[in-house]
Amino acid sequence: MNTDPRWISLATQIANGTGVTDGSKVGIFVTDVQAMTAVEAFVTEVYRRGGIPQVIASDERFDRAAVEHASVDVLATPAPLEEAAMRWADVHVSFRGMASPPKEQQDPVRLAAQRRGKGVISTLRWQETRWSLVRVPTSEWAELIGVPYETLLDEFFAGCIADWGTVAARWGRLCEELNTEDTVRIVSDDTDLTLSTRGRTWITFAGEANLPDGEIATAPVDDAVDGHITFPGTLWFAGARVTDLRLEFERGLVVNATASEGIELVNELLETDGGSRRVGELGVGTNAKITTFTGDLLIDEKILGTVHIALGRAYPACGGVNESALHWDIVKDLRGPSGYLYVGEQALIDGGRATGLLAPA
C-alpha cells in the first residue's frame, strides 16, 4: 500500500460517511487502475469494521470501446452485474479515476444511449444504498490541464478530509437562512438566470456522499427557471468535450442550446427523457480548500465561488420532483469581477468574492 497516511484517513472518512459497520454489504466500483491505492485502503477499512466488501473493477476505456462497437440497444441497457451489485449492497462506493479523455469525440447518439443505461444504475444507487462517489486525481489529468499532480492531490485530500460535523453545522445555518428566500439570480458575462426556490429546501453536502465535498444545494421549481447562462471554456462529460456552452431557459425548460464544440452531444442529452430539459439541482460550492478549476464536474462544483446547475433528476430531499435518467452537473465559475449570486436581495457572491455567511471562516 502507498505509505501516504492520507489514503488511510480518506478510507476512514468514507466508511464513517456511509455508515460501514459490522455486517455491512459494501459494493465497490473502480474505473481506473490509478485509483487502486484508494480502493485498497478502503477495502482494508471495511474488513477491519466487519463489513463484506465486493469489488467490480472496470476502466473508462472499456466504456469507450462499447460506444464505438456495441449496438445502441446494448448501450442503453443497464449493466446486469452493476445492477445486481446495487441491489445487493447496503453501501456503495465508486472510485472514479480522472482518466484522460479520448483523442477524438465519440458519436453523440451512442454516447447518450450509454448514459441512459448508466442512469438506471445511478438511480438505484441513490435510492437503495448509502453511497459515495470519490473522484481520484491522476497524473494523466494533471498533465492535461497543466497543473502539477501534487497540487491536485493536495487539494483532493484537503477537500475530502475535514471536520465535517463543524462544516455541516456552519453551512446548515446558511441553509436555514436561504430557506426563507424564494428566488436565486446568477449574473455574469452573458449570464442572467433567475430560478425560483419557493417551497423547496436547501441542504448541506458535507462529507456524506461525493468526495471531495462541500456544497449546499436545492431543487428549483420545475417551471420557474428563466434567462440564460454561459459556461466559457471546456468542460467534460463522460470523456466528451463541450466548449463554450450557452443555455437559454423559458418557464423551466431549455429552449435553446449552443456550443462551439460538442453541441451534438448536448442536444442528445437534452432529449434523454421528459425531465432532461429541466433543472433538477441548483448548487453552490462552499469548499475554500479547493481552488484549481479542473474541468471535472465532480471536483469543480465544490469550489467556493462557483455555482452549478444539474439538468435532469432532482433530489427528493430538497423537495424536488423532476424525474430523469440524466443528472448532468454543469459548473459556472463566478470568481471573476463580473460574477454575482443573489439569493433574495442578498449577494452571496459579489464581484467574484464570497460574502456574508458564504465567506470563508
Regions found by a protein language model. Give the residues of each.
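Short polybasic amphipathic segments
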Residues: T183-I186, L245, V255, P337-A347
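Short, glycine-/Ser/Thr-/acidic-enriched flexible segments
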Residues: V33-Q34, M98-S100, T138, R200, ...
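Short, solvent-exposed amphipathic alpha-helical segments in soluble enzyme
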Residues: F42-R48, T201-W202, L245-E248, E271-G274, ...
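Dual-mode signal for accessory low-complexity, basic/Gly-rich regions
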Residues: N256-V321
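Internal helix-turn-beta structural module
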Residues: G295-P360
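Oxyanion-binding "anion nests"
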Residues: G214-T258
